[in-house]
Design a protein with these regions (language model features):
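Active-site gating/metal-coordination segments in enzymes
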Residues: 143-200, 232
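Active-site core of metal-dependent hydrolases
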Residues: 180-254
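Divalent metal-coordination and catalytic microenvironments
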Residues: 9, 24, 29, 52, ...
Length: 254
């Protein structure tokens, strides 16, 4: 068993004030104890001095697109790029996240499921990386936000089919585009894209197979359509109003 004691700096455990004069004992990559440093006065194993720093839990980033590197024009950055190269970029971005203190990410839309093998490799411990949840293809309407890389579906039956396709491909959650967005030409971010009926069909099918769901939703009407359908989380929510907030609070929507 390999053990390491981290001591000297502050500790933030996510539940209250900074802990001072405490130490963290790690055995085989598992935190075994967090206690006042005096408790470990007789410790004979490896020590790491964290003086001047703060230890804290890993951060979960709930909305990433691992195929991109934060470019101003993300679509152009992968257009015409070999799928193998894109997969390597996904792995690089995942590993950079972990090196930055992000221990879990939720990928909310990738490219032809190239992120799935990276997810599996990182989650299994085969490669260094964070825990990854991945949605697969974003489900969107014809001409809607995300249509260039997403799964286009129109009407309730087609939306249900699209959800089933993502589940079959191995998606951890379902991503549905409720409104327009700023990265798609000639699309108004405030416009509702899917109708209330279409949103309900997609979210209900996700729930039927025990999947959480996320909705790109910026305009108030689209946000309400998603919330009333039972969506797990609203992504962005730029133009939400008090009615949207009240509905989210009532339903426990993130």
């Amino acid at each position: 068993m390999t053990s390491i004691l981290y001591s000297g700096g502050d500790i933030f455990d996510g539940t209250g004030e900074l802990l001072k004069g405490h130490a963290v004992l790690v055995d085989d990559d598992t935190i075994k104890d967090v206690a006042p440093a005096e408790k470990f006065s007789d410790y004979q194993g490896e020590r790491v001095d964290t003086s001047g720093g703060t230890l804290m839990p890993g951060i979960a980033d709930c909305h990433v697109h691992l195929v991109y590197k934060g470019e101003a024009d993300p679509r152009s950055s992968i257009e015409g790029v070999n799928p193998g190269e894109i997969t390597l970029r996904v792995l690089e971005n995942a590993q950079l996240s972990l090196k930055s203190g992000i221990t879990a990410v939720r990928d909310c839309g990738g490219r032809e499921y190239l992120e799935f093998p990276v997810r599996d490799a990182c989650n299994s411990g085969r490669f260094f990386g964070p825990n990854i949840m991945a949605s697969g293809k974003m489900i969107c309407m014809t001409g809607g936000h995300g249509n260039r890389n997403g799964r286009i579906a129109d009407g309730c039956d087609e939306v249900v089919k699209a959800v089933r396709e993502q589940i079959h491909a191995g998606s951890d959650l379902i991503k549905i585009m409720a409104t327009g967005g700023v990265m798609t030409p000639r699309v108004n971010p405030e416009d509702a894209h899917y109708s209330a009926e279409e949103m309900n069909a997609g979210v209900s099918e996700a729930k039927r197979f025990h999947k959480t769901s996320a909705s790109h939703a910026q305009g108030a009407e689209g946000i309400m359509n998603a919330v009333k359908a039972g969506i797990t989380s609203i992504e962005h929510g730029i133009f939400m109003d008090q009615e949207c907030l009240d509905a989210m609070m009532e339903r426990g929507t993130y």
